[in-house]
């Protein structure tokens, strides 16, 4: 559209706040412009003078509040520090814990009497090594349980020989020392016998199903796919990336170690890289192999771990270790076996056609997490040592070490003074839907230790042998200590599980035999015990609801002593207690004095009818 503005007249201002004057020059407004136009924002006089006088002066930047507080300039606005309150640790040692009352389960299904079904495997890839001259098929495990989110899973089978706990521990095929299906991410691929693993994605770690707790153990790992072994392809400057078909890391890791990263990222794993043979712990790499030497395809790496006896290990985590008395903790000439109170707080559940256990897993402690990822080299109370007083997780095991061999040649011992792992150095996660209470976080389920661990990246693959026949074999012991394949721990763990199942059945029979109800506790139901809970209250309202109902029911009434609890827990039968019947107090006193206590209770609550069930929930 053509403009109709007269020639010679100035165009209106593009500023929306500027008024348009008529051609006659008479303003629309008689008053000042700044008083009538609310949208106008005239510049201050100081700014106007600054613009006319010269360039704008540089604005002085004010320090942030944190800097002013650090310099002491804003003391009047610094909030008062809250008074530090010491958190009372209610955790009990594993030796003082009792079995949780078994859940009220329905009768086992006919399928529960059968062993767990073998895992379904789907073929994903095949790898061939020209150096070794062998091929491997790798499969993914379909619908597998994975230990994550603070929980650990195992398999159960119904057994009529265990009428109180109804189920006992079992495993899935293959029945040998191998990599664990449950202790590995979904991205890990296995071969048929689960002795070789690989992944096509980023770093993932697989742990074995056997662990070392004391003694000296050995396993071998052969590189299937990794850094190429052709010496002509090696870089000349030593800084370029080596040609490879993937990368791997080998070592040992505890249950707290993350499986979605490589071994050695945190304090819970010790590993060695294939590139340059660097050892890794706390996410820090150190040169270990000679310059220019790496771990390539076809190499056999031997991993040897040495741990002190559990008896000395227990004194270290309890803070009673004396170097002058206990010495350097050599395993020679010391009895390795000791009585361990295995506490397995488990919830049974059906998973497809199998029956499984769910229990709390151990979780990383704040002290070791800060020590691994913070810039400070040492914690507040000094570096980790057997005598560290800050936390049990910062204590180390004297005499422990990890030695590495390459193709039968000893490369050295890069790791010494490994971190202690017995509770309270390892703590169970407090899951509210898994019978988790603070009192039981120090429970030892018998499977806390150092596991063989392998990490793969971008197609790297490793095959392991945890027992003979070996590719090379363990070395000769320098001090006469026996060196065993860590695969021997598989049969030992079966024996330990069987013994623990029998102990659980006997304890459940003595403590909980003939008692009905859903709310449970340990042998001391007077409010002074551990207060462990279970049953349908846990499945309905969580641990908190069940625990509160148990405490309120037990503490109701004038008397809350053991004799009162004895008659208020459930069906106590006849009031005449004979020598052929064991009461609640009898079962609790069997382990103390050796014989049942058949004394008549001193008093009975008036509101309890003998011979009837009392619902505590």
Curated annotation (Swiss-Prot):
- Its primary localisation, in coarse terms, equals nucleus
Residue stretches of biased makeup (Basic residues): 57-69
The protein's UniProt keywords, in alphabetical order, are: Chromosome, Nucleus, Telomere
Question: How does inactivating the gene affect the organism?
Answer: Impairs tri- and dimethylation of H3K4. Leads to increased production of several secondary metabolites, including astellolides.
| Signal peptide positions (record) | none
Q: In the record, what terms sit under GO molecular function?
A: transcription cis-regulatory region binding
Description of how the protein assembles with itself and partners:
Component of the COMPASS complex.
Instruction: Output the PANTHER family linked to this UniProt entry.
Output: SET1/ASH2 HISTONE METHYLTRANSFERASE COMPLEX SUBUNIT ASH2, SET1_ASH2 HISTONE METHYLTRANSFERASE COMPLEX SUBUNIT ASH2
Can you say what this protein is called? Answer: COMPASS component cclA
What organism, scientifically named, is this protein from? Aspergillus oryzae (strain ATCC 42149 / RIB 40) (Yellow koji mold)
Q: What is the lineage of its organism?
A: Eukaryota, Fungi, Dikarya, Ascomycota, Pezizomycotina
């Amino acid at each position: 559209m053509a403009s109709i503005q007269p020639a010679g007249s100035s165009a209106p201002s593009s500023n929306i706040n500027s008024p348009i004057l008529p051609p006659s020059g008479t303003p629309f407004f008689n008053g000042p412009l700044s008083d009538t136009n609310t949208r106008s924002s005239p510049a201050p006089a100081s700014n106007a003078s600054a613009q006319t006088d010269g360039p704008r002066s540089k604005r002085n930047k004010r320090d942030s509040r944190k800097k002013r507080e650090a310099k002491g300039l804003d003391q009047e606005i610094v909030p008062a520090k809250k008074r530090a309150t010491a958190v009372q640790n209610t955790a009990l040692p594993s030796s003082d814990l009792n079995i949780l009352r078994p859940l009220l389960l329905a009768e086992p299904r006919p399928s529960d009497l059968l062993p767990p079904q073998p895992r379904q495997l789907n073929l994903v890839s095949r790898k061939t090594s020209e150096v070794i001259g062998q091929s491997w098929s790798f499969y993914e495990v379909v619908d597998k349980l994975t230990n994550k989110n603070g929980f650990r899973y195992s398999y159960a089978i119904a057994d009529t020989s265990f009428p109180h706990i109804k189920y006992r521990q079992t495993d899935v095929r293959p029945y040998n020392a191998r990599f664990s299906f449950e202790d590995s991410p979904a991205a890990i691929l296995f071969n048929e016998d689960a002795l070789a693993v690989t992944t096509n994605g980023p770093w993932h770690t697989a742990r074995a199903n056997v662990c070392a707790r004391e003694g000296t153990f050995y396993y071998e790992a052969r590189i299937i796919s990794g850094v190429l072994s052709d010496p002509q392809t090696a870089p000349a400057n030593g800084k370029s990336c080596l040609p490879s078909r993937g990368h791997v890391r080998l070592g040992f890791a505890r249950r707290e170690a993350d499986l979605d990263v490589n071994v050695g990222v945190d304090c819970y794993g010790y590993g060695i890289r294939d590139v340059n043979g660097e050892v890794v712990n706390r996410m820090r790499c150190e040169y270990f192999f000679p310059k220019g030497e790496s771990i390539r395809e076809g190499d056999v790496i031997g991993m040897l771990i040495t741990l002190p006896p559990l008896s000395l290990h227990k004194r270290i985590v309890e803070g009673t270790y004396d170097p002058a008395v206990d010495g350097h903790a050599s395993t020679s000439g010391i009895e390795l076996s000791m009585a361990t109170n295995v506490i397995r707080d488990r919830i049974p559940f059906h998973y497809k056609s199998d029956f499984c256990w769910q229990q709390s897993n151990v979780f990383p402690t704040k002290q070791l997490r800060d020590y691994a990822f913070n810039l400070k080299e040492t914690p507040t109370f000094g570096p980790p040592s057997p005598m560290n007083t800050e936390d049990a997780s910062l204590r180390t095991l004297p005499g422990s070490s990890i030695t590495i061999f390459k193709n039968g040649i000893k490369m050295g011992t890069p790791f010494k003074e490994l971190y202690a792992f017995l509770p309270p150095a390892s703590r169970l996660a407090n899951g509210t839907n898994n019978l988790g209470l603070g009192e039981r976080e120090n429970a030892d389920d018998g499977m806390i230790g150092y596991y063989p661990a392998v990490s793969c990246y971008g197609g790297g693959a490793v095959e392991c042998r945890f027992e003979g026949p070996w590719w090379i074999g363990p070395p000769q012991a320098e001090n006469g200590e026996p060196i065993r394949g860590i695969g021997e721990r598989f049969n030992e763990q079966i024996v330990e599980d069987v013994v623990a199942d029998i102990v659980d059945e006997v304890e459940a029979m003595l403590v909980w035999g003939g008692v009905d109800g859903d709310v449970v506790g340990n042998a001391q139901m007077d409010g002074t015990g551990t207060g462990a809970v279970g049953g349908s209250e846990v499945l309905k309202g969580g641990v908190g609801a069940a625990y509160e109902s148990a405490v309120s029911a037990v503490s109701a009434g004038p008397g809350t002593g053991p004799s009162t609890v004895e008659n208020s827990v459930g069906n106590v039968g006849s009031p005449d207690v004979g020598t052929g019947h064991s009461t609640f107090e009898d079962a609790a006193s069997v382990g103390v004095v050796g014989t049942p206590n058949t004394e008549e209770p001193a008093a009975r609550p008036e509101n309890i009818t003998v011979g009837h069930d009392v619902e505590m929930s």
